[in-house]
Amino acid sequence: MTLITDIRLRRVLDSRGNATVEADVLTESGGFGRGKAPSGASTGEYEAIELPANEAIAKAREEALPRLIGEVHAGNQRDVDAALHAADGTDDFSGIGANSAVAISMAAAKAGADVLGAPLYQHLGGTFRGNEYPTPLGNIIGGGEHAADATNIQEFLAAPVGAPSVEEAVFANAAVHQEVHDILADRDLPAGKGDEGAWAPSVSDDEAFEIMDEAVETVADDFGFAISFGLDVAGAELYDDEADGYVYDDGVKSTEEQIEYIAGKVEEYDLVYVEDPLDENDYEAFADLTAQVGDQTLVCGDDLFVTNVERLQAGINADAGNSILIKPNQIGTLTDAVDAIELATASGYESVVSHRSGETEDTTIAHLAVATDAPFIKTGAVGGERTAKLNELIRIEDNAV
């Protein structure tokens, strides 16, 4: 362990052109780490609070840096993150901002790894690390909060579950992305791209399912291994209190109809992953869907759990879902994220590590996914801020970090 001697904070751009927080952590023995905070578009009601970048930086300089510089060792992540909590003084990081907190937390972890001369995933891994690598979930067709005039379902995700290596999986997802482009072109369907690089055509959800199914089948035949797909439904964005149901272009589905609809799609397309299929406050509906299809697919809580151990425990008690999405900025520190993963693992839930729609070239989540033996990592298929993580996964597998 080595004492933190300086922390530098600045504004940088994220992938949407918005300001975010970058942190540098330096130690007395020459260790260095840099972390950048991502930002979400489809955010859960219970997420940690992100402040405007300038405000988050000013608050962190005033409250957090004096508790860290000359006081805490970079190699002790739990102490670093406890100091961030103490500096903030709230339960949602509304004091210094989750964006400043997570940037500092990630930078300190990297500085600690740098001092040890170890890859970040080894520094974070502890007893988690198994022999497998996460399968990347590639966002191929997008709508919802990520793209206007597109599908109601927010993400259609390629899942190369049969890939023999991370490298093959990454290139398979890129090929599915290109194949969907070609299918759209053949159908004279123009499509721009959403926040995460997914195609955003003006098609119905049913046509998007059909296109994805055709694309993954074609690419699976070309690559010679199984490729499935999954969904991020973003159910909280579809649910409307006044309508008392899930609002689609073709009408409103009741909770019972939404459960039946998603369960039917799992059966029809053999989906391997379904994220936030229902509203973020409806543990009972999540439990009902999990009882129906939980032995066939991962029913993953993102807005439902927000990387929060208390909300996860409530879900475990209710048998709601069978997996949790892990987003460090959603809870504010790496320690909080790892605590959620530990609880999930102990309770038989899988943990899926994820990017945000507003991303940076930071690669911390690639290391976190490897360190914690995650079955999947959500980090897009194309775009520099996405491929930064994917290429890092390839390097990790090749022992080149």
UniProtKB/Swiss-Prot annotation:
InterPro entries from the UniProt entry: Enolase (IPR000941), Enolase-like_C_sf (IPR036849), Enolase-like_N (IPR029017), Enolase_C (IPR020810), Enolase_CS (IPR020809), Enolase_N (IPR020811)
Main localization of the protein described in the UniProt heading: cytoplasm
Protein name: Enolase
Keywords assigned by UniProt, alphabetized: Cytoplasm, Glycolysis, Lyase, Magnesium, Metal-binding, Secreted
SMART domains on file: Enolase_C, Enolase_N
Coiled-coil blocks: none
Primary role: Catalyzes the reversible conversion of 2-phosphoglycerate (2-PG) into phosphoenolpyruvate (PEP). It is essential for the degradation of carbohydrates via glycolysis.
Pathway involvement of the protein, from the record: Carbohydrate degradation; glycolysis; pyruvate from D-glyceraldehyde 3-phosphate: step 4/5
The keyword Cytoplasm is assigned to this record: yes
GO-annotated molecular function: magnesium ion binding; phosphopyruvate hydratase activity
Cellular localization per UniProt: Cytoplasm; Secreted; Cell surface
Enzyme class: lyase
Organism annotation: Haloarcula marismortui (strain ATCC 43049 / DSM 3752 / JCM 8966 / VKM B-1809) (Halobacterium marismortui)
Cofactor(s) for this UniProt protein: Mg(2+)
Record's catalysed reaction(s): (2R)-2-phosphoglycerate = phosphoenolpyruvate + H2O
Homology family: Belongs to the enolase family.
Database matches in Gene3D superfamilies: Enolase-like C-terminal domain, Enolase-like, N-terminal domain
GO biological process, one term: glycolytic process
Annotated Gene Ontology cellular component terms: cell surface; extracellular region; phosphopyruvate hydratase complex
Annotated catalytic residues: E196, K327
Binding site for Mg(2+): D232, E275, D302
Record: residues binding (2R)-2-phosphoglycerate: Q154, K327, R356, S357, K378
Cofactor note as given: Binds a second Mg(2+) ion via substrate during catalysis.
EC code: 4.2.1.11
Positions of disulphide bridges: none
